[in-house]
């Protein structure tokens, strides 16, 4: 959604083209990482005939804002303190998955979200 800043929502045509490309190519296991907003969050975007698209945002290791922009797709966060993000890919598990974590500078885990790889792929044809 439009938040008054430079954002993916400002480019609806390009966003639609990108999602169509993902669907056309059946590109599996995509996960987006972003930053430069001075807070952390995890967003989950749903499009028809596509698996959920996750966006992991982490930025603010040395500077954080005291506000977060609106985001109807946010499922975790926002974390407004100085922080860093960590992604761990576990392929040896019976259910391969990605763990997305946000840690603050006081060594406190603020967010942990697990995404099963089978969730971010198209059904086998």
Regions found by a protein language model. Give the residues of each.
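Long, structured stretches of catalytic cores involved in phosphate-ester chemistry, encompassing
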Residues: 1-125
């Amino acid at each position: 959604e439009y938040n008054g800043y430079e954002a993916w929502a400002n480019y609806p045509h390009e966003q639609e083209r990108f999602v169509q490309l993902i669907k056309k190519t059946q590109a599996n296991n995509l996960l987006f990482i972003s930053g430069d907003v001075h807070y952390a969050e995890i967003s989950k975007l749903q499009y028809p005939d596509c698996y959920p698209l996750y966006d992991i945002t982490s930025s603010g290791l040395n500077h954080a804002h005291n506000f977060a922009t609106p985001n109807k797709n946010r499922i975790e966060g926002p974390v407004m303190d100085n922080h860093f993000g960590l992604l761990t890919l576990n392929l040896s598990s019976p259910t391969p998955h990605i763990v997305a974590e946000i840690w603050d500078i006081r060594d406190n885990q603020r967010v942990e979200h697990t995404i099963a790889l089978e969730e971010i792929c198209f059904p086998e044809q």
